[in-house]
Amino acid sequence: MLWNTQYFRIEGMISLGWPRLAKTSILKFVPIAQNHRIRKMKVQDDFILTIDDSEDDIHYDDYDADAVDEEMPSNVELKKKSKKATPAKDSDFNGEFLFEADVNKDLSSATDMNWDFDMGSKTESNRASNTVDLDAIISRNRKPDDDEFPSSFPSEEELQEPEQENIDSDDEDLAIDGFGAGAIAENEDESSQDESESEEEDDITEPVPSFANISTQDFNSDSAAGSSDSEEDEEEIAKKNAFFAEGDKEKSMMTTTHSSFQSMNLSRPILKGLSNLGFEVPTQIQDKTIPLALLGKDIVGAAVTGSGKTAAFIVPILERLLYRPKKVPTTRVLILCPTRELAMQCHSVATKIASFTDIMVCLCIGGLSLKLQEQELRKRPDIVIATPGRFIDHMRNSQGFTVENIEIMVMDEADRMLEDGFADELNEIIQACPKSRQTMLFSATMTDKVDDLIRLSLNRPVRVFVDNKKTTAKLLTQEFVRVRPQRELLRPAMLIYLCKELFHRRTIIFFRSKAFAHKMRVIFGLLSLNATEIHGSLSQEQRVRALEDFRDGKCNYLLATDVASRGIDIKGIEVVINYEAPATHEVYLHRVGRTARAGRSGRAITLAGEGDRKVLKGVFKNSSAQNTKLVNRNLDFNKVEKFGKEIEELEPVVQKVLDEEKQERELKIAERDLKKGENIMKYGDEIRSRPARTWFQSEKDKQASKASEAKDKKSLAKRKKQMEKEEVPRAYKKTKNDRLSNKKSTKKSKSKRK
C-alpha cells in the first residue's frame, strides 16, 4: 500500500521489510512543515532515527498530534501512484521561503579547509608557543618619549616637492654621490680635469635617458664571455627546432589574440571565479598559453615578473578538470613551487578561481601539520600544490596517496628550484609520475640550466616567450643611490632616511643576510618604524604572519631576503628598496618585480656600492634597450649623518634586545625538550611502534650530490678565471671604433714600410 506524501512524510530508517513492519511497528507521519526541525536535530545530535520492534510509539520533541489533525484535510484519499503530475495548489508553495547560501556555514566540512593560517596557527599552537615576542622586547627597551608609530603621513605631493628642491639645491652632495659619473671611474684619485667633467655629468636631477658615460668597452670586457657563450651554432639551433613543436597550428594559435576571457570559450564557473578576482582581459602570457594548454600541449613559458604566469596555468587546469570522471576521486594535477610562500599564493589563486566548482585543492608545504596534510591527501584532492621536498615525503610515507593518475604536472619557477638544489628531487618526482602526462614549465628567467630539465621531462613542448629574458615592467621607475667607500658605514642611516623621510607605506626592503635583516628589524622597532621580517630563519607560522600583517596594512615595511623575491604578489606595493645590489641581474629582476605588477606603476631604489658595478652595468644596458626610466637619486646627507649618530647610540640597546631574545628562545627550547622527554617516557612504546619515514636518498647520496654540485661550481669558476687570464681574441661584431682603429693601424704599418 502506498501513501500519498503530499502533506506528510514518513520519518525513520526501515530495516525490517514491509510485511513485518505493517504488523509489529507503528509509523508516525510528520507534516512537511516540521521536516526542518528533525533535519536540524539529526545534524546536531549526529545519530540516525530507527524503528524498533519493541517500541509501542515514537515520541518526537516539540510535536503536537492534535495540531497535525487540525492541519490535515478531511478529504485525503489514498490513490495509486501515477506518472501524471498532481496539480499544484496554493498551499503547496510557501511564498516566504528563501534560499540561503550560508545556511550551513557553522557546520565543519573538510572541503572548507582553506590554509589561511588562522587555522594553521591553531593547529600548530605548540610550535607557535616556542616563538619569541620580539615586539614586546623592543617596546620594553624603547625610549619612553618615543611615539609608537606615526598616525598620519604626508601626501605623495608633499613628499615630492621638497625632494625635488633638495636635489636642485645641494649641488655639492650631488657631485659627490651622483651615480652617473662613477660608473666609469676606476680610481678615486684622478686628475682635476676628469673631476670637473664628472661633476658636470653628475648634475642630473631628472630621469637619465641613457647612461652614455658607460663605455661600450666596459660592457664588452665583462660580457664578452656571456655573449660568446650565448651565440649558438647551427647544429644546436637545429636540435632545438627538432625538439620543440613549432608547427603551423601552434604558430597560428599564438598569433591569435583574445580581447577577454569570454572569447576563450571557458566554462561559466571559471569565468565567474575570474570576474570575482577582477580578471577581465588576459595578459600576453595568458593569451598565448591558455589555448595551447587546453589542447594538452607541453609548454615552456617565460615572461616578465608580474605578468600573470600563475593564472596562465591555473585556468586551463581548472577548465579541463570540470570534465573529469567524478565516480572515483583521484589526484590528477601536481603543481611544484620552489618556496612555501609561492606555493601558498598559488593555492590561494587556485581556490579563488575554483570557488564555484567542486574541484578540491590541497596544499603540501613544510612548516604545516604533517597529519593534517595526510588527512587531506587521503581524500584524493584533484590538485596538489607542493614544494618538492614535502611532496616526496608524502609520496613515500603517506598511506593511500599515489601519483599513478597524475595527468598534468606544472613546475613553476623551475630555474629557482634547480638553483636551490632541488635537481635530484625533481628527477625523482618526474620518474614517479606517468610519462603520458601533460607538463608545463614556467619561469620569469629561462636560463640554459633549465635545458636538461626540459629535455628530461617535456615531450615536444611549445615555447611561449612573451618578453625578452631580462626585462622589467614598463611602468617601473628604477632609482640608484651611489654609496662611496668612505660612506659605506652610513648605509643603515641612508635606509632609515629613505623610510623616515620619503617612503612611509607598502615598502619591501631586500637584504643579502638573514642576520642583518633581523638586526635592522630591531633598529626599525626602536626607531618607531612599523616593520616586520621574512627570511629562512623564521618558522612557517612567523613567515605567514609577517606576510599577512604586511598585506593587511598592519606593518608598513617588510624586511626580506630573497625568500620573498619570487612570485609573491601583494597588491599595492609602492616601493622596493635594495639595501645592497643583488649578486646577479636575474635576482635583481625578481626583486624589483614585486612592484609595478599587473599594469600598475612602481619604484625600485638600489643603494649601489663600488662592488656592484657588474650587476648595474647589466641593468643600464637592458634599460637603454627597453627605454625604461633610470633616475639618479640624491640624499640630504646632513639628515643621513644625524640618523647615523642615532643608530650608533642605539647599538648597545640593539645588542641588549638581541641577547634578551636569545635567552627567551633558549628557555622556550629547553621547555620544549623537557616536554618532549616526558612524552617519550609516557608513550615510548607507541612512538617506537610507528613506521619510520623514508627518503629516496641516503646520507651518503646526499653528501655525494652536494660534493658534485660544489665541484661543478669550482670548475666553472676556474674556467672563467682561465678565460680571463688568456688573451684570446673573442669573436664579436666589430663596432665603428674598432673599424677606425684597424684602419689607423694599417695606415701606420704601410707608412713605416715606405
Curated annotation (Swiss-Prot):
EC identifiers of the protein: 3.6.4.13
Cell membrane found in the keyword field: no
Reactions performed catalytically: ATP + H2O = ADP + phosphate + H(+)
Binding site residues for ATP: A303, V304, T305, G306, S307, G308, K309, T310
Locus of motif DEAD box: 412-415
Keywords: ATP-binding, Coiled coil, Helicase, Hydrolase, Nucleotide-binding, Nucleus, Ribosome biogenesis, RNA-binding
Origin: domain of life: Eukaryota
One MF term in the entry's GO annotations: ATP binding
SUPFAM superfamilies from the UniProt entry: P-loop containing nucleoside triphosphate hydrolases
Swiss-Prot/TrEMBL GO biological process terms: rRNA processing
Biased composition (Basic residues): 742-754
Protein's recorded name: ATP-dependent RNA helicase drs1
Organism: Schizosaccharomyces pombe (strain 972 / ATCC 24843)
Organism lineage string: Eukaryota, Fungi, Dikarya, Ascomycota, Taphrinomycotina
